[in-house]
Amino acid sequence: MKFSELWLREWVNPAVDSETLSEQITMAGLEVDGVEPVAGAFHGVVVGEVVECGQHPNADKLRVTKVNVGGERLLDIVCGAPNCRQGLKVAVATVGAVLPGDFKIKAAKLRGEPSEGMLCSFSELGISDDHDGIIELPADAPIGTDIRDYLKLDDNAIEISVTPNRADCLGIIGVARDVAVLNQLALNEPTIEPVAATIQDTFPIQVEAPQACPRYLGRVVKGINVKAATPLWMREKLRRCGIRSIDPVVDVTNYVLLELGQPMHAFDLDRLNGSIIVRMAEEGETLTLLDGNEVKLNADTLVIADQQNALAMGGIFGGEHSGVNEETQNVLLECAYFNPLSITGRARRHGLHTDASHRYERGVDPALQHKAIERATRLLIDICGGEAGPVVDITSDADLPTRATITLRREKLDRLIGHVIADEQVSDILQRLGCNVVKTDAGWQATAPSWRFDMEIEEDLVEEVARIYGYNNIPNIPTQAPLIMTSHREASLALKRVKTLLVDHGYQEAITYSFVDPKIQGLIHPNEASLSLPSPISVEMSVMRLSLWSGLLSAAVYNQNRQQSRLRLFESGLRFVPDASADLGIRQDLMLSGVITGTRYEEHWDLARQAVDFYDLKGDLEAVLALTGKLSEVEFKAENNPALHPGQSAAIYLCGERIGFIGVIHPELERKLDLNGRTVVFELLWDKVADRVLPDANEISRFPANRRDIAVVVAENVPAGDILAECKKVGANQLVGVNLFDVYRGKGVAEGYKSLAISLTLQDTTRTLAEEEIAATVAECVAALKQRFQASLRD
């Protein structure tokens, strides 16, 4: 928000300079982004009157004038402005004046005629970019007065960043309140007297959506002159706030917007039909806006309509059909309180952002509307003339926001601030902020003012007290806290340790949004319901993720499109699964996921370029599972997953319970996501592996180990893992190692079969095993494999 420092000082005028005032505003939480003078550096410019104005004898576009600047004689000045005329009050730069850019005014001759000064435009004084003509001052401007004093140009335009919670500061009144409280001064509010109705004309108003519009005020003003000139003082205030003067009706509503923070709108009364109806739009209903653009409305958009058409998007933008124009004589002034939730997001949906929507989305004081409409009525009649009818007020008290009553405990205040502020000072701060305060035994009970939506809980009051007391006044004392040694379960496996392991394996941690694209999620998890957001950031971020794969695969595509072909990413985070049995109907599971793609190794002269495969990621995952001490209990079983390749994927089971998946992305999904090359992913339910098995110390045998190799032929569909598990079960007492070291298909092995070469390592802790014992164990393994899998020894 941008405003004039002098306008602010009309409301409250602390005895501090501009720099200190800006510092106060910043420390109050309204960060000052910039301070700049409202006019250029100049001197020697005064108010003058054009006494004579005639055509230059030697130039068609120049005029020769005689100007009274309050001196002993009239000044001869040559001027080329088309609006120069006799009787006009103007800004005159006399001989010796210095204009912005160090431009010095000297006596000269222009086309043979003497010129003893210059009649100035706004642009020549560094006030604005208006080059259309010289400045036209009011007829009562005192001749000879310094123009800087007359126009109050020794002023600054202050621009502040207003946080969403401080919508009350989107008007001069809100900033002035804070400055008054900080300096312990009274607020000099302008006297706003009710404008008596001089006619009894009203216009019917119906509110069909009271929850969206709890209060709607309308007032008929007839017989206005819309061609009247907006006073210079108002145009200047608007300009210094960054708003261009348009016509007196719009200027008045903009003035009230800036002064009180209350948006208003004026309808051309003669273009309205029947009555004003505040309702929700019909699906697909259209409206042509004031800027000429046509928008198609949704059913959740609030509109102001008459008996025939929608006239405006409520709280956002007016319509062209009912807008005020140069032919307007009668207007209906609108002043309303709209529920912020009924406005939020609607403007953005249509690519709009207006001063009105900016304020209504954040919240407007629901007690302000009567004051605002009286202020606008008085200003409009003073400028344009006309007669006002009575105010029509349609209010649904049940739908208006209630003022929060908050308990502030002395103990909580002292603990959070870390400093004791006297009771009397706390009460004074809260009262000056507009709260109704009652002192209690434990602290205070405060009722928030109507304009402060952000005062809801105890911590809000603590913040307000600290803010007004002054953060700089709170002594710097080191934080003191009792040292409590928390117990640490040795069996707990820190997620940080797993992340470190993955980083050591060449992975990088990714952090992706919990909000994902429903199209991508639908490809990965078809036919699975997900939680949709009622007000998403965008369509591409409108559902909560069912797994981390959506974000990781999108990140992989993003990086591949930027010439990063070799990727190793992992992420830990929550997934959100609809579950009727869970709290609030949603289950949140902490997941650990990873993705790899590209080559197995970084490019190197001594290494072949090989693409990653299933076993690369499986090896990394087994390293993670080894940290838990449960790797021996983990099984990888063939199981269908729509996102994974049916022949290169597996479900991960721990003690018979499925805890995740691993596999190559399905070729069809790879194509739809535009993934480049083979991509392998895994995902684990972290809570299922977060507790590790504590290692047991075992005796190391001092007797020799014996290795025997066997090659068994089994059907193609028999998992090698099942073969190894069966061997371990049979030789549990003396078999200390089972390993698959070769898989063969081809000559000598029938089609549909494969040969698995397995090494069996046997060892005892008490003695050297005899050859007969070794042979017996190997024979038992072969027999068990033959019985369960119809395996046979390969010749």
UniProtKB/Swiss-Prot annotation:
Paired cysteines (S-S): none
Keyword NADP part of the UniProt annotation: no
Entry superkingdom: Bacteria
Entries under SMART domains matching the protein: B3_4, B5, FDX-ACB
Domain B5 residues, every copy: 401-476
PANTHER family, per database record: PHENYLALANINE--TRNA LIGASE BETA SUBUNIT, PHENYLALANYL-TRNA SYNTHETASE BETA CHAIN AND LEUCINE-RICH REPEAT-CONTAINING PROTEIN 47
Similarity field: Belongs to the phenylalanyl-tRNA synthetase beta subunit family. Type 1 subfamily.
Protein name: Phenylalanine--tRNA ligase beta subunit
